[in-house]
Amino acid sequence: MATATDRAPHQVQVHTPTTQRVDVPRRGYDVSGGGIKTLLPERGPSTSQIIAVLVGVPTGGTLLLLSGLSLLGTIIGLAIATPVFIFFSPVIVPAVVTIGLAVTGILTAGACGLTGLMSLSWMINFIRQVHGTTVPDQLDSVKRRMADMADYVGQKTKDAGQEIQTKAQDVKRSSS
């Protein structure tokens, strides 16, 4: 059996750190040396972006000003109206409840009417699907029946005219 002294010695390689260093780029800094310029786009903004800014900033500013004025007016109005509401609350509360109930009733009636119309529309569409005919098909059928009836009436009128003519000739022959 082989012992540890019989074996050839093993060589172990040890790697020492090299002088090369991997730099992790930090935010806002480019290793290539471009500095802050690398953060900027290579070309300027497009014409549509410039127009959007020129239109958007004044419009947004105006709307912000109007919303601020609206908020200010609401706060002033609430500050003035609060004592009035407290003073007249025995009258205002029942009036608000009455108006609220009336509006709720009107909206409920409208919703019920709309639901009824939708149900009627659904039933009509369901019946059309059950019968397998649609309005254009029914109109074509009615047109064909009207044309057939017109042909029939025309033929009957022609037959009646010939019969009258035949009888008139018979009367003329018998009287001569």
UniProtKB/Swiss-Prot annotation:
Gene Ontology biological process terms from the UniProt entry: lipid storage; response to freezing; seed oilbody biogenesis
Modified residues (N-acetylalanine): A2
Topology relative to the membrane: Multi-pass membrane protein
Family: Belongs to the oleosin family.
Record-linked InterPro entries: Oleosin
Transmembrane annotation, as ranges: 50-70, 75-95, 96-116
Species this protein is from: Arachis hypogaea (Peanut)
GO cellular component: membrane; monolayer-surrounded lipid storage body
Phylogenetic placement of the source organism: Eukaryota, Viridiplantae, Streptophyta, Embryophyta, Tracheophyta
Protein name: Oleosin Ara h 14.0103
Keyword S-adenosyl-L-methionine: no
Residue segments, region Disordered: 156-176
Tissue specificity comment: Expressed in seeds (at protein level).
Keywords attached to this entry: Acetylation, Allergen, Lipid droplet, Membrane, Transmembrane, Transmembrane helix
UniProt function note: May have a structural role to stabilize the lipid body during desiccation of the seed by preventing coalescence of the oil. Probably interacts with both lipid and phospholipid moieties of lipid bodies. May also provide recognition signals for specific lipase anchorage in lipolysis during seedling growth.
Localization (cell): Lipid droplet; Membrane
